[in-house]
Amino acid sequence: MHITQLVLRHFRCFDVVDFFPLPGLNFFIGENGSGKTSLLEAVHLMGYGRSFRGRVRDGLIRHGSENLEIFVDWQETALINARRRRAGLSHYGQEWIGRLDGQKIMHLASLCAALAVITFESSSYQLINSNAELRRRFLDWGLFHVEPDFLDLWRRYTHVLKQRNSLLKQKEELAMLEAWDQKLSEVGEQLTFRRFQYLERLKQRVIPLISRITPNLKIHGFNFNHGWRRHELPLIDALFISRERDYQYGYTSLGPHRSDWTPQFSSIPGVHFLSRGQGKLITLMCLLAQAQDFFDQRGEWPILALDDLASELDQKHQWRVLEMLAEIPAQVLITGTEIPQGLKPFFSVGAMFHVEHGAITRMF
């Protein structure tokens, strides 16, 4: 899929912008504060239903305005049932209002399912060395887009988990807790299996990508922590064993909501030994592997939004990343404060835009 038109009204530093990106590589150059990141933020907002830079009160609406609007048209590129799509997202007062193909949507998940965006921004490197919740979200995003029933499965697990935690806080009777343990284990085992299988698919894509981009790291796979000792006992038994502790804590201490995964290297002891630049490359390759899996399952590429791609990467690694991006038929939106040397060989296969004072001008 690729965006054919993006309209912003009263979004961040933009008053009104009507922009037409190209299907392939799109480079956006401008000074800090010019609106480059805000442009990708708007695309991200349409694909995730939230910003990666804060909430509405953090300056999402242009100063002096009372509302914001984002409209996006895109072309699906799957071989079967490809069509043109249109979506809009507005914020008035305290409410977000979304529309998809001319119809008002009740939940932003409908919009997120339609427009797939993979975003790399300043905090994305935390994927591999920060808290486990980010890594669970990473897996769940991919499953949400390639397995139609995954959202329902995830919601069922979340609902049952909340019910069990409520019973633990209220010190409810054992019989009632046992019933919810059974439900939690049934859904939890399914959720864990989906995540594990998806991570195994990603491993087959990540290893060759990292070997090509930074071969010295020698990645050999991922370690998946199920959230309990699954190799020793099923979830239903683990919940029974932890029941007394859970009563004491007032919440469920194990299960898929405690799962995690980490890349494994033969060249270094762990991710904490990576430089910031290496961490950025590993994260970026994980995201590209996710994009490849999306293509393999759906028959089209998601939109890639890469903010400040060249920072902390030397010219050699810039070139390798851009060479890889130029080989895939995905729409890629890349920002930077200047034109890095590593990008110049790829201008012939993309377009360059200058962002200044809330305006976007094509350079070539």
From Swiss-Prot:
SUPFAM superfamilies: P-loop containing nucleoside triphosphate hydrolases. PROSITE patterns: RECF_1 (PS00617), RECF_2 (PS00618). It is found in: Cytoplasm. The keyword 4Fe-4S does not apply. ATP binds at residues 30-37. Transmembrane segments: none annotated. It comes from the Bacteria. GO terms for cellular component: cytoplasm. Pfam families: SMC_N. InterPro entries: DNA-binding_RecF (IPR001238), DNA-binding_RecF_CS (IPR018078), P-loop_NTPase (IPR027417), RecF/RecN/SMC_N (IPR003395), RecF_2 (IPR042174). GO terms for biological process: DNA replication; DNA synthesis involved in DNA repair; double-strand break repair; SOS response. Keywords: ATP-binding, Cytoplasm, DNA damage, DNA repair, DNA replication, DNA-binding, Nucleotide-binding, SOS response. Belongs to the RecF family. The RecF protein is involved in DNA metabolism; it is required for DNA replication and normal SOS inducibility. RecF binds preferentially to single-stranded, linear DNA. It also seems to bind ATP. NCBIfam families: recf. PANTHER family: DNA REPLICATION AND REPAIR PROTEIN RECF. This is DNA replication and repair protein RecF. It comes from Xylella fastidiosa (strain Temecula1 / ATCC 700964).
